[in-house]
Regions:
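SIR2/sirtuin-family catalytic core signature
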Residues: 1-2, 69-177
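A conserved mid-domain beta-alpha-beta active-site/ligand-binding segment of alpha/beta enzyme cores
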Residues: 49, 54-56
């Protein structure tokens, strides 16, 4: 049986749940993009118990499936179907847009494109320009069903919406198998 994991991508998670923090401010996001870029290119390193760890870049992981270890949520944008909900993809989410942009460029590279077989689906009602950008990034936009709650929505409206989105995701997963 396949498992479904939900990742909160806007934060940092170390070994302890108490270390989870949300990033605020452009300087944090710019720093995050630098780390994401290093991760994507295979130049990202980190230390665990005084041992230096190196991670293969996405191009190498595309060529060698045995390296696809899902070491980060970033990997999912290249190797798993991804369903995005609850984000408006404003400028604060530039890190996510950076990954989507790079992925779309790699989809136009014949060597990399045949290895990227996943889908990315966005739930929400983005502005017209953002919707066009997402579609250019090869992201499927589900803006009408289910309909997101409006500006004056109550908490229960959001709960109903998220449950409807999760049902839609479950349906899509069943259809794919």
């Amino acid at each position: 049986r396949r498992s479904l994991r939900i990742w909160n991508i806007h934060g940092t998670y170390n070994e302890k749940p108490s270390s989870f923090t949300i990033q605020y401010g452009y300087e944090h996001y710019c720093g995050c993009i630098g780390k994401i870029d290093s991760y994507l290119k295979g130049t990202y390193t980190y230390w665990v118990q005084k041992q230096k760890k190196e991670i293969a870049g996405i191009p190498e992981k595309l060529r060698k499936p045995q390296l696809q270890l899902e070491e980060s949520w970033i990997d999912l944008f290249f190797f798993s179907n991804v369903y995005i909900m609850g984000l408006n993809l404003s400028s604060e989410e530039i890190d996510l847009l950076y990954i989507l942009n790079l992925r779309s460029r790699w989809l136009r590279d014949s060597k990399k494109a045949r290895c990227i077989q996943n889908r990315i689906v966005f739930y929400g009602q983005p502005a017209k320009a953002m919707k066009a950008l997402l579609e250019e990034f090869d992201v499927e936009v589900c803006s009408s069903s289910p309909t997101p709650p409006g500006k004056n929505a109550k908490g229960t409206d959001y709960e109903k919406y998220y449950r409807a989105v999760l049902r839609d995701i479950q349906y899509r997963i069943k259809q794919a198998h």
